[in-house]
């Protein structure tokens, strides 16, 4: 391998990413004795070689690549009931639900569960009309405080973004990162990173609401930077906190890569939903379905 390829291999090793090496210039450099020699001119062996290559790829792939982990289906017994609270606001796309909501509904259906979808103003009535208490209530983070207030103690509840903190990232580390909000001081820099590159609408969650709630909660004069799409600062040490979106448009590996970069830089990191729940004072309730994350968060707050 040349120097650039060596860098890639070293980085893959650091991130514990399995690598399958394919040499396409064996006449220039020997590939070693542990590979499979193939004559590219021999068409009769093409299918056999490709099938063997696919088999090798499956061998080194992680389990979550082959089998997608559940979003919420494992939190509720089969045949259980889930209530989902879906606000329809300026940011909601016309004529459809957003991806995390759609994926969560599908996941629950795959696990044989019943899903009831309501707007926030119809939630209380829907709850009263149920003959049996639901096993789980999930809401958009923006109405987490309303959900927590209207949901009887004993019924587990969380947010879509918290579910995606577990699906796409490290929920324990993200819960711990939320504890850093209380320690922010005047002049501290905070990075808000969003996977989407959409144009900000009125009262945009990332560019308007979170900064407003953050400053109101802390009472501090914070410097807030924004990053969108695949742009992510390489120098993270200047930040006291990174707030990453739920990552529904990114794969798990990319979100984990960002989390690991923050961890390496010693910078606390959390995500939109967990951050918003902390700012609204209901994070302990939202983390109830995830005991390990709840314990870590409580430890950070002490």
Predicted regions and their residues:
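Conserved C-terminal guanine-recognition region of P-loop GTPase G domains, centered on the G4
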Residues: 1-44, 57, 69-74, 97-129, ...
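Short, charged N-terminal beta->alpha structural module
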Residues: 52-53, 84, 90-108, 191-219
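Redox- and metal-dependent alpha/beta enzyme cores, enriched for Fe-S-associated oxidoreductases
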Residues: 164-221, 227-231, 236
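Cofactor-cradling patches in redox/metallo enzymes
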Residues: 229, 239, 244-280, 286-287
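Conserved beta-strand elements of the Class I
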Residues: 81-83, 189-191, 243
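Flexible loop/N-cap segments at domain edges
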Residues: 137
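G-domain G4 guanine-recognition motif of GTPases
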Residues: 1, 19-49, 85-93, 118-121, ...
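Ser/Thr/Gly-rich flexible loops in soluble cytosolic domains mediating phosphotransfer, phosphorylation
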Residues: 19, 23, 27-31, 35-64, ...
